[in-house]
């Protein structure tokens, strides 16, 4: 009797796990990948933040407990977002962008300043970073614009320029904080989405060259950015000054070797490496889990990116353009931000202050990226429902 009761209670979970993928109306693998990354992030934040948490608060697991709260908020908000139909996102994409602009303007007036950058709005439980909201809002808006003005983007320069004006407006507010890293992520993702939508190659090349030129000017205009570039080119020239963070990160990579020092055994996190639990958590992963652990984490992230690109291609192939463009945008965003974060930790690119998706400590980043994953799941779900309800094609149509 008890066994039958247990089987009855477990049957929904059994169906969820063992039902063949073609019959399921959502991507289970995508959920497991995202949860795996979030669990990895929780473990690594607990390990990397232990020393600084003890010094600042007297509680060794202070940042871990806050990160657990962020994970709970992220999963709760994502479960709500998952129920919102895509046509609602398309309909209110302009409103979402306007809210982001207002938040970016507000942070310049009443924002909390950390290390000379005013990027956060204090909300009690956590500090909201409007730049993270602006990323997702922009990509949703661009996807909606590409649906409404697809022909104009492909055929006229005017249609190509309009979304760039929105990007320039957001970039202005971001650079006032200042936040060049988020601006670069938005720029790269936007031009990639326009290119996928059919923008002309010469427009794409001209925009890339213009963007590179602008970044160079912005670097030369600010001494602290120039110091980051020079320290990136030769960090050992000033290992206790401008090159300190990068040299400590490189030492973490060197200590990790193939299999790492073991979970919790990092030396660099003992307040030698600044931002060990946030922007440079990947260096702690490299030191504690080694080359093998680094490869496993990167495989998880790029599996998520690959899933996003597959979902985008499937949607576009079946004329689900809003979901398709948005899925491509999310995939490119995750991929580029990962490359920049990992590249900064490994000394391949200058430090940009970007988080490692779903892993680094930070409430705004974790919540917004979790919402992005839930959007991917929703996009895939609606595409599967559309294909399930699509009338079978006739033999004549298949021959054509």
UniProtKB/Swiss-Prot annotation:
It is an enzyme of class 2 (transferase). GO terms for biological process: cell wall organization; FtsZ-dependent cytokinesis; peptidoglycan biosynthetic process; regulation of cell shape. GO terms for molecular function: lipid-linked peptidoglycan transporter activity; peptidoglycan glycosyltransferase activity. Its EC number is 2.4.99.28. GO terms for cellular component: cell division site; plasma membrane. The keyword Glycosyltransferase applies. NCBIfam families: ftsW, PRK10774.1. This is Probable peptidoglycan glycosyltransferase FtsW. The gene is ftsW.
């Amino acid at each position: 009797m008890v066994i039958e009761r247990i089987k009855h209670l477990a049957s929904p979970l059994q169906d969820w796990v063992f039902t063949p993928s073609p019959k399921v109306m959502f991507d289970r693998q995508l959920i497991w990948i995202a949860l795996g990354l979030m669990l990895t992030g929780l473990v690594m934040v607990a390990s990397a933040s232990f020393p600084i948490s003890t010094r600042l608060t007297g509680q060794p697991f202070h940042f871990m407990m806050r990160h657990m709260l962020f994970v709970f908020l992220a999963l709760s908000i994502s479960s709500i977002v998952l129920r919102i139909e895509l046509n609602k996102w398309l309909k209110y994409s302009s409103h979402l962008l306007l809210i982001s602009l207002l938040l970016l303007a507000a942070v310049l007036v009443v924002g909390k300043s950390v290390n000379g950058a005013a990027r956060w709005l204090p909300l009690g439980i956590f500090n909201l970073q409007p730049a993270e909201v602006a990323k997702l809002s922009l990509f949703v808006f661009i996807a909606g614009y590409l649906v409404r003005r697809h022909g104009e983007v492909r055929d006229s320069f005017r249609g190509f320029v309009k979304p760039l004006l929105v990007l320039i407006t957001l970039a202005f507010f971001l650079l006032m904080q200042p936040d060049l890293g988020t601006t670069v992520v938005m720029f790269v993702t936007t031009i990639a989405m326009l290119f996928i939508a059919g923008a002309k190659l010469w427009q794409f090349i001209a925009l890339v060259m213009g963007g590179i030129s602008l970044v160079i000017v912005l670097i030369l205009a600010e001494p602290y950015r120039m110091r980051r570039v020079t320290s990136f080119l030769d960090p050992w020239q000033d290992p206790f000054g401008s090159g300190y963070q990068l040299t400590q990160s490189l030492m973490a990579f060197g200590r990790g070797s193939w299999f790492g020092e073991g979970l919790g055994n990092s030396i660099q996190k003992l307040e030698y490496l600044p931002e060990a639990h946030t922007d440079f958590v990947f260096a702690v992963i490299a030191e504690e889990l080694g080359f093998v652990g680094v490869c496993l984490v990167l495989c998880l992230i790029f599996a998520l990116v690959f899933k996003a690109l597959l979902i985008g291609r499937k949607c576009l192939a079946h004329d689900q353009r809003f979901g398709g463009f948005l899925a491509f945008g999310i995939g490119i965003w995750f991929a580029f931000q990962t490359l920049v974060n990992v590249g900064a930790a490994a000394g391949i690119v200058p430090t940009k202050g970007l988080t490692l998706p779903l892993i680094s400590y930070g409430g705004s980043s974790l919540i917004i990226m979790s919402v992005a994953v839930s959007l991917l799941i929703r996009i895939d779900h609606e595409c599967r429902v559309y294909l399930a309800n699509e009338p079978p094609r006739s033999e004549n149509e298949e021959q054509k």
